[in-house]
Amino acid sequence: MNWNAILPEAILAIGILTVFILELFLERKHYKFLSVLAFIFVVLSGYSIFFVNYPAKLFFDGFSVDALNLIGKLFILAVTGFVLLSSYDYFSKKNSQYGELPYLYLIATLGLMVMISSDNLAIIFTGLELASITMYILVGLFRREYLSKEGAFKYLVIGTTGTSMYALGSALVYASSGSMVLSPVKEENTLFALGVILIISALALKVSAVPFHFWTPDAYEGAPTPTTAYLSTVPKIGMYFLFVKLTMYLFSAFPDWKYVVMLLAVLSMFYGNIVAYAQKSVKRLLAYSSIAHAGYFLTALTAVDKHLFSALLFYVFVYALATVGAFTVLAILEKKEGWTHHFLDFKGLKEENPVLASMLALFLFALIGIPPAAVFLGKLGIFFGLVKTDMFALGILFAIASLISAGYYLKVIVYMFLYSGEVRHGQTTVSAGEAFTVLGTAFLVIFFGLFPHVVLDFILRALS
Protein backbone atom coordinates (compact mmCIF):
# COMPACT_ATOMS: atom_id res chain seq x y z
CA MET A 1 0.00 0.00 0.00
CA ASN A 2 1.28 3.46 -0.95
CA TRP A 3 1.15 5.21 2.43
CA ASN A 4 2.88 8.23 0.90
CA ALA A 5 -0.44 9.05 -0.78
CA ILE A 6 -2.06 10.02 2.53
CA LEU A 7 0.89 12.10 3.77
CA PRO A 8 -1.06 15.44 3.89
CA GLU A 9 -3.88 13.86 5.90
CA ALA A 10 -1.41 12.10 8.21
CA ILE A 11 0.44 15.36 9.01
CA LEU A 12 -2.85 17.13 9.69
CA ALA A 13 -3.99 14.27 11.97
CA ILE A 14 -0.69 14.50 13.90
CA GLY A 15 -1.26 18.25 14.18
CA ILE A 16 -4.75 17.70 15.61
CA LEU A 17 -3.44 15.29 18.27
CA THR A 18 -0.50 17.57 19.13
CA VAL A 19 -2.62 20.70 19.57
CA PHE A 20 -5.28 18.71 21.43
CA ILE A 21 -2.79 17.28 23.95
CA LEU A 22 -1.00 20.61 24.46
CA GLU A 23 -4.32 22.38 25.01
CA LEU A 24 -5.01 20.08 27.96
CA PHE A 25 -1.90 21.28 29.80
CA LEU A 26 -1.49 24.90 28.69
CA GLU A 27 -3.33 27.89 30.11
CA ARG A 28 -5.62 30.08 28.03
CA LYS A 29 -2.95 32.74 27.68
CA HIS A 30 -1.11 30.33 25.34
CA TYR A 31 -4.01 30.37 22.87
CA LYS A 32 -1.94 32.36 20.35
CA PHE A 33 0.82 29.74 20.49
CA LEU A 34 -1.69 26.96 19.75
CA SER A 35 -3.09 28.92 16.79
CA VAL A 36 0.38 29.46 15.33
CA LEU A 37 1.23 25.78 15.90
CA ALA A 38 -1.95 24.73 14.08
CA PHE A 39 -0.98 27.06 11.22
CA ILE A 40 2.47 25.44 11.03
CA PHE A 41 0.88 21.99 10.66
CA VAL A 42 -1.37 23.35 7.90
CA VAL A 43 1.71 24.68 6.07
CA LEU A 44 3.53 21.34 6.51
CA SER A 45 0.50 19.45 5.23
CA GLY A 46 0.29 21.73 2.19
CA TYR A 47 4.03 21.42 1.54
CA SER A 48 3.84 17.61 1.71
CA ILE A 49 1.38 17.60 -1.21
CA PHE A 50 4.31 18.28 -3.56
CA PHE A 51 5.93 15.00 -2.46
CA VAL A 52 2.89 12.74 -2.85
CA ASN A 53 3.20 9.94 -5.39
CA TYR A 54 0.09 9.85 -7.56
CA PRO A 55 -2.10 8.46 -8.99
CA ALA A 56 -2.77 6.00 -6.19
CA LYS A 57 -5.70 4.05 -4.76
CA LEU A 58 -6.01 2.86 -1.17
CA PHE A 59 -8.50 1.18 1.14
CA PHE A 60 -10.07 -1.19 -1.39
CA ASP A 61 -10.22 1.53 -4.08
CA GLY A 62 -12.36 3.70 -1.83
CA PHE A 63 -9.72 6.42 -1.48
CA SER A 64 -7.93 7.81 -4.52
CA VAL A 65 -5.18 10.36 -4.95
CA ASP A 66 -4.86 12.18 -8.25
CA ALA A 67 -3.77 15.59 -9.49
CA LEU A 68 -7.25 17.11 -9.20
CA ASN A 69 -7.92 16.27 -5.58
CA LEU A 70 -4.37 17.25 -4.62
CA ILE A 71 -5.08 20.71 -6.07
CA GLY A 72 -8.32 20.77 -4.07
CA LYS A 73 -6.45 19.92 -0.86
CA LEU A 74 -3.91 22.66 -1.54
CA PHE A 75 -6.71 25.21 -2.00
CA ILE A 76 -8.43 24.06 1.21
CA LEU A 77 -5.22 24.23 3.25
CA ALA A 78 -4.27 27.66 1.86
CA VAL A 79 -7.57 29.24 2.85
CA THR A 80 -7.60 27.44 6.23
CA GLY A 81 -4.14 28.86 6.95
CA PHE A 82 -5.36 32.40 6.34
CA VAL A 83 -8.37 31.86 8.62
CA LEU A 84 -6.18 30.50 11.44
CA LEU A 85 -3.84 33.48 11.27
CA SER A 86 -6.69 35.97 11.30
CA SER A 87 -8.59 34.44 14.22
CA TYR A 88 -6.39 34.43 17.32
CA ASP A 89 -6.43 38.18 18.06
CA TYR A 90 -10.18 38.40 17.39
CA PHE A 91 -11.00 35.75 19.99
CA SER A 92 -8.53 37.28 22.46
CA LYS A 93 -10.28 40.65 22.24
CA LYS A 94 -13.64 38.90 22.69
CA ASN A 95 -12.32 37.18 25.85
CA SER A 96 -13.15 33.87 24.17
CA GLN A 97 -9.76 32.20 23.94
CA TYR A 98 -11.02 28.67 23.52
CA GLY A 99 -8.04 26.36 23.26
CA GLU A 100 -10.19 23.93 21.26
CA LEU A 101 -10.63 26.38 18.39
CA PRO A 102 -7.34 25.75 16.48
CA TYR A 103 -7.76 21.98 16.34
CA LEU A 104 -11.47 22.26 15.51
CA TYR A 105 -10.49 24.10 12.32
CA LEU A 106 -7.97 21.32 11.61
CA ILE A 107 -10.55 18.56 12.17
CA ALA A 108 -13.03 20.18 9.78
CA THR A 109 -10.26 20.62 7.21
CA LEU A 110 -9.20 16.98 7.55
CA GLY A 111 -12.79 15.86 6.95
CA LEU A 112 -13.00 17.90 3.76
CA MET A 113 -9.67 16.53 2.50
CA VAL A 114 -10.86 12.96 3.10
CA MET A 115 -14.14 13.76 1.35
CA ILE A 116 -12.64 15.02 -1.91
CA SER A 117 -10.27 12.02 -2.16
CA SER A 118 -13.03 9.47 -1.58
CA ASP A 119 -14.26 7.25 -4.40
CA ASN A 120 -16.77 5.54 -2.15
CA LEU A 121 -20.10 7.05 -1.14
CA ALA A 122 -19.69 5.76 2.42
CA ILE A 123 -16.23 7.32 2.87
CA ILE A 124 -17.50 10.58 1.35
CA PHE A 125 -20.21 10.51 4.02
CA THR A 126 -17.60 9.97 6.75
CA GLY A 127 -15.48 12.93 5.63
CA LEU A 128 -18.53 15.12 5.16
CA GLU A 129 -19.80 14.41 8.66
CA LEU A 130 -16.39 14.85 10.27
CA ALA A 131 -16.33 18.36 8.81
CA SER A 132 -20.01 19.14 9.44
CA ILE A 133 -20.16 18.15 13.12
CA THR A 134 -17.06 20.22 13.83
CA MET A 135 -18.58 23.24 12.09
CA TYR A 136 -21.72 23.05 14.25
CA ILE A 137 -19.44 23.49 17.28
CA LEU A 138 -17.54 26.36 15.65
CA VAL A 139 -20.75 28.31 15.01
CA GLY A 140 -21.82 28.05 18.66
CA LEU A 141 -18.51 29.01 20.30
CA PHE A 142 -19.90 32.30 21.65
CA ARG A 143 -22.19 30.34 23.94
CA ARG A 144 -23.00 33.41 26.06
CA GLU A 145 -24.47 35.21 23.04
CA TYR A 146 -28.01 34.44 21.93
CA LEU A 147 -27.28 34.88 18.20
CA SER A 148 -24.43 32.38 18.35
CA LYS A 149 -26.56 29.74 20.10
CA GLU A 150 -29.44 30.36 17.69
CA GLY A 151 -27.12 30.14 14.69
CA ALA A 152 -25.54 26.90 15.92
CA PHE A 153 -28.93 25.27 16.45
CA LYS A 154 -30.19 26.32 13.03
CA TYR A 155 -26.96 25.22 11.34
CA LEU A 156 -27.28 21.86 13.11
CA VAL A 157 -30.85 21.41 11.85
CA ILE A 158 -30.08 22.23 8.23
CA GLY A 159 -26.86 20.20 8.37
CA THR A 160 -28.55 17.06 9.67
CA THR A 161 -31.28 17.48 7.04
CA GLY A 162 -28.60 17.45 4.34
CA THR A 163 -26.92 14.46 5.96
CA SER A 164 -30.18 12.50 5.94
CA MET A 165 -30.80 13.28 2.27
CA TYR A 166 -27.26 12.26 1.32
CA ALA A 167 -27.50 8.98 3.27
CA LEU A 168 -30.83 8.06 1.67
CA GLY A 169 -29.60 9.06 -1.79
CA SER A 170 -26.47 6.93 -1.40
CA ALA A 171 -28.59 3.97 -0.26
CA LEU A 172 -30.78 4.28 -3.36
CA VAL A 173 -27.76 4.52 -5.67
CA TYR A 174 -26.32 1.41 -3.98
CA ALA A 175 -29.64 -0.43 -4.30
CA SER A 176 -29.80 0.33 -8.03
CA SER A 177 -26.13 -0.20 -8.96
CA GLY A 178 -24.97 -2.74 -6.35
CA SER A 179 -21.86 -0.74 -5.45
CA MET A 180 -20.86 2.20 -3.26
CA VAL A 181 -17.70 2.81 -5.30
CA LEU A 182 -17.87 5.67 -7.79
CA SER A 183 -17.57 4.45 -11.36
CA PRO A 184 -19.15 5.50 -14.65
CA VAL A 185 -22.78 4.32 -14.64
CA LYS A 186 -24.22 3.48 -18.05
CA GLU A 187 -27.81 2.72 -17.17
CA GLU A 188 -30.33 4.58 -15.10
CA ASN A 189 -33.53 3.49 -13.43
CA THR A 190 -36.06 5.13 -11.16
CA LEU A 191 -34.19 4.26 -7.96
CA PHE A 192 -30.91 5.58 -9.37
CA ALA A 193 -32.52 8.81 -10.59
CA LEU A 194 -34.15 9.41 -7.20
CA GLY A 195 -30.86 8.70 -5.43
CA VAL A 196 -29.00 11.19 -7.63
CA ILE A 197 -31.64 13.88 -7.00
CA LEU A 198 -31.32 13.35 -3.24
CA ILE A 199 -27.51 13.57 -3.40
CA ILE A 200 -27.70 16.76 -5.49
CA SER A 201 -30.18 18.21 -2.98
CA ALA A 202 -27.97 17.28 -0.01
CA LEU A 203 -24.89 18.90 -1.53
CA ALA A 204 -26.94 21.92 -2.63
CA LEU A 205 -27.97 22.33 1.01
CA LYS A 206 -24.34 22.12 2.11
CA VAL A 207 -23.39 24.94 -0.31
CA SER A 208 -26.43 27.04 0.75
CA ALA A 209 -28.21 26.98 -2.61
CA VAL A 210 -31.87 28.06 -2.82
CA PRO A 211 -34.29 26.62 -1.69
CA PHE A 212 -32.02 24.90 0.85
CA HIS A 213 -30.51 28.16 2.10
CA PHE A 214 -33.05 28.83 4.90
CA TRP A 215 -31.26 29.76 8.16
CA THR A 216 -27.82 29.96 6.53
CA PRO A 217 -27.74 33.78 6.94
CA ASP A 218 -28.72 33.37 10.61
CA ALA A 219 -25.91 30.88 11.16
CA TYR A 220 -23.37 33.12 9.41
CA GLU A 221 -24.50 36.19 11.35
CA GLY A 222 -24.44 34.43 14.73
CA ALA A 223 -21.08 32.73 14.25
CA PRO A 224 -17.81 34.44 15.25
CA THR A 225 -16.66 36.41 12.20
CA PRO A 226 -13.48 34.33 11.50
CA THR A 227 -15.67 31.21 11.69
CA THR A 228 -18.09 32.78 9.20
CA ALA A 229 -15.09 33.36 6.92
CA TYR A 230 -14.26 29.65 7.22
CA LEU A 231 -17.84 28.41 6.73
CA SER A 232 -18.42 30.51 3.63
CA THR A 233 -15.22 29.43 1.88
CA VAL A 234 -13.37 26.26 2.87
CA PRO A 235 -16.34 23.82 2.82
CA LYS A 236 -17.45 25.34 -0.50
CA ILE A 237 -14.09 24.50 -2.08
CA GLY A 238 -14.42 20.88 -0.94
CA MET A 239 -18.05 20.64 -2.04
CA TYR A 240 -17.42 21.87 -5.59
CA PHE A 241 -14.44 19.56 -6.08
CA LEU A 242 -16.77 16.75 -4.96
CA PHE A 243 -19.52 18.03 -7.25
CA VAL A 244 -17.14 17.87 -10.24
CA LYS A 245 -16.19 14.28 -9.38
CA LEU A 246 -19.82 13.19 -8.99
CA THR A 247 -20.78 14.96 -12.23
CA MET A 248 -18.18 12.94 -14.13
CA TYR A 249 -19.31 9.65 -12.58
CA LEU A 250 -22.84 9.32 -11.23
CA PHE A 251 -24.65 12.17 -12.91
CA SER A 252 -23.51 11.25 -16.43
CA ALA A 253 -26.00 8.34 -16.39
CA PHE A 254 -28.86 10.65 -15.46
CA PRO A 255 -29.17 13.17 -18.34
CA ASP A 256 -31.93 15.17 -16.69
CA TRP A 257 -29.76 16.06 -13.68
CA LYS A 258 -28.63 19.24 -15.44
CA TYR A 259 -32.16 20.65 -15.30
CA VAL A 260 -32.26 20.12 -11.53
CA VAL A 261 -28.91 21.90 -11.16
CA MET A 262 -29.99 24.65 -13.57
CA LEU A 263 -33.11 25.37 -11.51
CA LEU A 264 -31.08 25.53 -8.28
CA ALA A 265 -28.55 27.83 -9.95
CA VAL A 266 -31.08 30.34 -11.30
CA LEU A 267 -33.04 30.47 -8.03
CA SER A 268 -29.86 30.98 -5.99
CA MET A 269 -28.39 33.67 -8.24
CA PHE A 270 -31.47 35.87 -8.29
CA TYR A 271 -32.82 35.22 -4.79
CA GLY A 272 -29.45 35.79 -3.11
CA ASN A 273 -28.77 39.01 -5.02
CA ILE A 274 -32.25 40.50 -4.65
CA VAL A 275 -32.63 39.77 -0.92
CA ALA A 276 -29.12 41.12 -0.26
CA TYR A 277 -30.43 44.61 -1.09
CA ALA A 278 -32.81 44.47 1.90
CA GLN A 279 -30.07 43.77 4.46
CA LYS A 280 -29.01 46.35 7.05
CA SER A 281 -25.98 44.37 8.25
CA VAL A 282 -22.92 44.04 6.01
CA LYS A 283 -22.10 40.66 7.56
CA ARG A 284 -25.57 39.37 6.70
CA LEU A 285 -25.28 40.93 3.24
CA LEU A 286 -22.16 38.85 2.60
CA ALA A 287 -24.11 35.76 3.72
CA TYR A 288 -26.67 36.39 0.97
CA SER A 289 -23.81 37.09 -1.40
CA SER A 290 -22.54 33.56 -0.72
CA ILE A 291 -25.99 32.20 -1.64
CA ALA A 292 -25.84 34.10 -4.94
CA HIS A 293 -22.34 32.77 -5.59
CA ALA A 294 -23.60 29.24 -4.99
CA GLY A 295 -25.86 29.89 -7.97
CA TYR A 296 -22.96 31.14 -10.11
CA PHE A 297 -20.92 28.06 -9.25
CA LEU A 298 -23.77 25.63 -9.94
CA THR A 299 -24.22 26.98 -13.49
CA ALA A 300 -20.85 25.42 -14.33
CA LEU A 301 -22.15 21.96 -13.37
CA THR A 302 -24.88 21.90 -16.02
CA ALA A 303 -22.58 20.27 -18.58
CA VAL A 304 -19.64 17.87 -18.50
CA ASP A 305 -16.93 20.11 -19.93
CA LYS A 306 -13.35 20.41 -18.66
CA HIS A 307 -13.12 24.13 -19.49
CA LEU A 308 -16.29 24.84 -17.51
CA PHE A 309 -15.00 22.76 -14.61
CA SER A 310 -11.59 24.48 -14.65
CA ALA A 311 -13.25 27.93 -14.64
CA LEU A 312 -15.48 26.79 -11.76
CA LEU A 313 -12.65 25.51 -9.56
CA PHE A 314 -10.51 28.57 -10.27
CA TYR A 315 -13.48 30.84 -9.49
CA VAL A 316 -14.27 29.04 -6.21
CA PHE A 317 -10.67 29.43 -5.03
CA VAL A 318 -10.30 33.14 -5.82
CA TYR A 319 -13.80 33.83 -4.45
CA ALA A 320 -12.68 32.14 -1.21
CA LEU A 321 -9.60 34.37 -1.01
CA ALA A 322 -11.62 37.56 -1.55
CA THR A 323 -14.28 36.47 0.95
CA VAL A 324 -11.76 35.59 3.68
CA GLY A 325 -10.12 38.98 3.12
CA ALA A 326 -13.46 40.79 3.43
CA PHE A 327 -14.49 38.93 6.59
CA THR A 328 -11.07 39.53 8.14
CA VAL A 329 -11.57 43.28 7.69
CA LEU A 330 -14.99 42.91 9.35
CA ALA A 331 -13.39 40.97 12.22
CA ILE A 332 -10.84 43.75 12.74
CA LEU A 333 -13.58 46.39 12.76
CA GLU A 334 -15.68 44.31 15.17
CA LYS A 335 -13.04 44.80 17.85
CA LYS A 336 -14.11 48.47 18.04
CA GLU A 337 -16.36 49.45 20.91
CA GLY A 338 -20.01 49.39 19.84
CA TRP A 339 -19.38 48.09 16.30
CA THR A 340 -22.34 46.05 14.97
CA HIS A 341 -21.68 45.73 11.19
CA HIS A 342 -24.77 47.88 10.53
CA PHE A 343 -24.48 50.05 7.42
CA LEU A 344 -24.45 53.15 9.64
CA ASP A 345 -21.23 51.91 11.26
CA PHE A 346 -19.52 52.04 7.86
CA LYS A 347 -20.39 55.70 7.24
CA GLY A 348 -17.20 57.69 6.78
CA LEU A 349 -14.94 54.72 7.53
CA LYS A 350 -12.34 56.19 5.19
CA GLU A 351 -11.85 59.04 7.68
CA GLU A 352 -11.26 56.77 10.70
CA ASN A 353 -9.50 53.84 9.02
CA PRO A 354 -8.54 54.68 5.41
CA VAL A 355 -6.44 51.53 4.96
CA LEU A 356 -9.16 49.16 6.20
CA ALA A 357 -11.78 50.98 4.11
CA SER A 358 -9.57 50.68 1.02
CA MET A 359 -8.90 46.98 1.57
CA LEU A 360 -12.58 46.21 2.10
CA ALA A 361 -13.42 48.17 -1.06
CA LEU A 362 -10.83 46.12 -2.98
CA PHE A 363 -12.39 42.84 -1.83
CA LEU A 364 -15.91 44.05 -2.66
CA PHE A 365 -14.80 45.17 -6.13
CA ALA A 366 -13.24 41.72 -6.53
CA LEU A 367 -16.52 39.99 -5.59
CA ILE A 368 -18.37 42.13 -8.16
CA GLY A 369 -15.93 40.80 -10.74
CA ILE A 370 -14.12 43.97 -11.76
CA PRO A 371 -10.71 43.41 -13.40
CA PRO A 372 -7.88 42.95 -12.64
CA ALA A 373 -9.34 40.90 -9.76
CA ALA A 374 -9.21 37.16 -10.46
CA VAL A 375 -12.95 36.71 -9.80
CA PHE A 376 -13.57 38.53 -13.11
CA LEU A 377 -11.72 35.79 -15.01
CA GLY A 378 -13.62 33.09 -13.13
CA LYS A 379 -16.95 34.64 -14.12
CA LEU A 380 -15.78 35.20 -17.68
CA GLY A 381 -14.61 31.59 -17.96
CA ILE A 382 -17.97 30.25 -16.79
CA PHE A 383 -19.88 32.59 -19.13
CA PHE A 384 -17.90 31.53 -22.22
CA GLY A 385 -18.09 27.88 -21.10
CA LEU A 386 -21.89 28.11 -20.93
CA VAL A 387 -22.04 29.67 -24.40
CA LYS A 388 -19.68 27.01 -25.78
CA THR A 389 -21.86 24.19 -24.41
CA ASP A 390 -25.05 25.71 -25.93
CA MET A 391 -26.29 27.05 -22.58
CA PHE A 392 -26.62 30.56 -23.99
CA ALA A 393 -29.82 31.42 -22.09
CA LEU A 394 -28.24 30.34 -18.79
CA GLY A 395 -25.16 32.39 -19.66
CA ILE A 396 -27.31 35.51 -20.15
CA LEU A 397 -29.04 34.92 -16.79
CA PHE A 398 -25.60 34.47 -15.21
CA ALA A 399 -24.45 37.83 -16.62
CA ILE A 400 -27.66 39.62 -15.53
CA ALA A 401 -27.38 38.25 -11.98
CA SER A 402 -23.75 39.40 -11.81
CA LEU A 403 -24.78 42.91 -12.84
CA ILE A 404 -27.57 42.97 -10.23
CA SER A 405 -25.06 42.09 -7.50
CA ALA A 406 -22.94 45.17 -8.18
CA GLY A 407 -25.48 47.47 -6.51
CA TYR A 408 -25.30 46.15 -2.96
CA TYR A 409 -21.50 45.84 -2.98
CA LEU A 410 -21.21 49.42 -4.24
CA LYS A 411 -23.65 50.55 -1.52
CA VAL A 412 -21.12 49.53 1.14
CA ILE A 413 -18.33 51.35 -0.70
CA VAL A 414 -20.47 54.50 -1.04
CA TYR A 415 -21.19 54.48 2.70
CA MET A 416 -17.47 54.18 3.48
CA PHE A 417 -16.16 56.83 1.09
CA LEU A 418 -18.93 59.30 0.26
CA TYR A 419 -20.73 59.70 3.59
CA SER A 420 -19.50 61.28 6.80
CA GLY A 421 -19.70 59.19 9.95
CA GLU A 422 -22.26 60.16 12.57
CA VAL A 423 -20.71 57.96 15.27
CA ARG A 424 -16.97 57.74 15.87
CA HIS A 425 -15.76 54.30 16.91
CA GLY A 426 -12.09 55.24 17.01
CA GLN A 427 -9.08 53.26 15.89
CA THR A 428 -8.62 49.52 16.27
CA THR A 429 -5.59 47.30 16.64
CA VAL A 430 -4.53 45.00 13.82
CA SER A 431 -2.55 41.89 14.72
CA ALA A 432 0.29 40.56 12.57
CA GLY A 433 -1.87 37.58 11.58
CA GLU A 434 -4.76 39.78 10.50
CA ALA A 435 -2.45 42.06 8.52
CA PHE A 436 -0.85 39.06 6.80
CA THR A 437 -4.27 37.63 5.91
CA VAL A 438 -5.65 40.89 4.51
CA LEU A 439 -2.53 41.74 2.52
CA GLY A 440 -1.91 38.14 1.45
CA THR A 441 -5.42 37.53 0.14
CA ALA A 442 -5.47 40.94 -1.58
CA PHE A 443 -2.16 40.18 -3.29
CA LEU A 444 -3.29 36.73 -4.46
CA VAL A 445 -6.65 38.01 -5.77
CA ILE A 446 -4.80 40.55 -7.96
CA PHE A 447 -1.88 38.24 -8.81
CA PHE A 448 -4.13 35.43 -10.06
CA GLY A 449 -6.13 38.03 -11.98
CA LEU A 450 -2.97 39.07 -13.83
CA PHE A 451 -1.46 35.58 -14.11
CA PRO A 452 -4.38 33.10 -14.06
CA HIS A 453 -2.42 30.42 -15.92
CA VAL A 454 -0.42 29.77 -12.73
CA VAL A 455 -3.52 27.98 -11.38
CA LEU A 456 -5.66 27.30 -14.46
CA ASP A 457 -3.01 25.28 -16.31
CA PHE A 458 -2.67 22.87 -13.38
CA ILE A 459 -6.44 22.46 -13.09
CA LEU A 460 -6.87 21.85 -16.84
CA ARG A 461 -4.09 19.24 -16.87
CA ALA A 462 -5.62 17.52 -13.85
CA LEU A 463 -9.05 17.41 -15.50
CA SER A 464 -7.55 15.99 -18.69
Curated annotation (Swiss-Prot):
GO terms for cellular component: plasma membrane. The keyword Manganese does not apply. It is an enzyme of class 7 (translocase). Its EC number is 7.1.1.-. GO terms for biological process: ATP synthesis coupled electron transport. Its main location: membrane. InterPro entries: NADH-Q_OxRdtase_suN/2 (IPR010096), ND/Mrp_TM (IPR001750). Keywords: Cell inner membrane, Cell membrane, Membrane, NAD, Quinone, Translocase, Transmembrane, Transmembrane helix, Transport, Ubiquinone. It is a multi-pass membrane protein. One of its GO terms (molecular function) is quinone binding. NDH-1 shuttles electrons from NADH, via FMN and iron-sulfur (Fe-S) centers, to quinones in the respiratory chain. The immediate electron acceptor for the enzyme in this species is believed to be ubiquinone. Couples the redox reaction to proton translocation (for every two electrons transferred, four hydrogen ions are translocated across the cytoplasmic membrane), and thus conserves the redox energy in a proton gradient. This is NADH-quinone oxidoreductase subunit N 1. It comes from Aquifex aeolicus (strain VF5). The gene is nuoN1.
